[in-house]
Each structure stands twice: as structure tokens, then as C-alpha cells.
Regions:
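PLP-dependent class I/II
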Residues: 1-187
């Protein structure tokens, strides 16, 4: 909800988990709202999910290096208590402006690899050699461009946030990361 800065309501999330629940997906920073959960919120989520050992957790961290206002990304990889059921997805497309190159990666526990393979065979094809070489160069190269892009995205975020909130009957939550704005035009 906008009034909660689009943060996960942990109490509600836990109340919805039942014997059929197999996976919880966390997208941080969030698409489409741009909301960002800081470490304290992630700590609470992990603590609440420890009670459900049969529920896998998928952490979509594709925007992990596009965090505004000097905050740090609390990757779920830093929580040993859930590592045996944690899936982390990330990639090059957002950080290195390689959208469309379809180059990403995932970290899966060995117990979930067979399930991942069943999904992957129907979901995607191999990344081209050009994409793979470009990805290697992006990682090896200077990260100054990433900082420059982040600064530009933050300036754009500020501009769109202020502009939308200056409009009559429009409000907009201030995104904490990614490159999305989620204006409320329902007034």
C-alpha cells in the first residue's frame, strides 16, 4: 500500500502462508513501485520465514545496485538460516544498461536445481556469445559508469517525484531504488 511505502506487511504475509505455499518472492528494490526494503525490514522477513522451513524464498535482486540515497542492498544471501531454500536472481541488464541482452544468473540450493531446470527449459534459451562477452567486460571494467548512471537515475527520480507531486490530484511515493515511479492518480 502507498501509505506503507509499498513495504511488505509481514503479519499479513505470514497469515497467508498455508500448507499449499511453496514459494515467497521478494523483489527488492521493487518493480513497479521503486520501493526499497532496508536491512531491518529484510531481517524481520527472514525471521518470520524461518518458521516455515518448507517454503522456498526467491529473491529478485536485479536492481540491487540501483539503490538511492546511499543506502546499501541487504542481499538475502547474507542470511545463513535460509540458504538451503533460497533462490537469488540477478543479472547485468539493469546495472549495466544491457536491457534486451538477456544475460543473468541465479544461485540455487542443490535441492532445487532439478525444479529450476524444469522451469528454465521452457522459459529461456542460451545467452548469445556476444552477450556473455559483454557481461564479462561489464564486470571487469571500471564501475565508474555504474555510479554515474546511478547518480543520473537518482536525479531523474527526484525530478519525476517532485513533478508528479506538484500536479493536482496526483501523489507519488518517493522510490528508494530501481527506475520506476508509481503515481497515484485515483484522487
Amino acid at each position: 500500500k502507498e501509505e506503507d511505502s509499498f513495504q511488505i506487511n509481514i503479519k499479513k504475509m505470514v497469515s497467508l502462508i498455508n500448507k499449499k505455499t511453496r514459494l515467497i518472492i521478494i523483489n527488492n528494490p521493487n518493480n513497479p513501485t521503486g520501493s526499497f526494503m532496508q536491512k531491518e525490514k529484510i531481517d524481520e522477513i527472514v525471521k518470520s520465514l524461518i518458521k516455515f522451513p518448507n517454503v522456498a524464498i526467491l529473491s529478485d535482486e536485479i536492481y540491487s545496485r540501483l539503490i538511492f540515497d546511499n543506502h546499501e542492498m541487504p542481499s538475502l544471501l547474507k542470511y545463513p538460516a535460509i540458504r538451503n531454500r533460497l533462490i537469488v536472481l540477478d543479472g547485468w541488464s539493469k546495472t549495466y544498461c544491457m536491457t534486451g541482452w538477456r544475460l543473468g544468473w541465479g544461485i540455487w540450493p542443490s535441492t532445487l536445481i532439478n525444479h529450476a531446470n524444469k522451469l528454465a527449459v521452457n522459459d529461456h534459451s542460451c545467452a548469445s556469445a556476444v552477450s556473455q562477452i559483454a557481461g564479462i567486460e561489464a564486470l571487469r571494467g571500471s564501475q565508474k559508469a555504474v555510479k554515474k548512471i546511478l547518480k543520473e537515475f537518482q536525479e531523474r527520480r527526484n525530478l519525476i517525484f517532485e513533478g508528479l507531486n506538484s500536479l493536482k490530484n496526483v501523489s507519488c511515493f518517493k522510490p528508494g531504488g530501481a527506475f520506476y515511479a508509481f503515481p497515484n492518480v485515483s484522487k
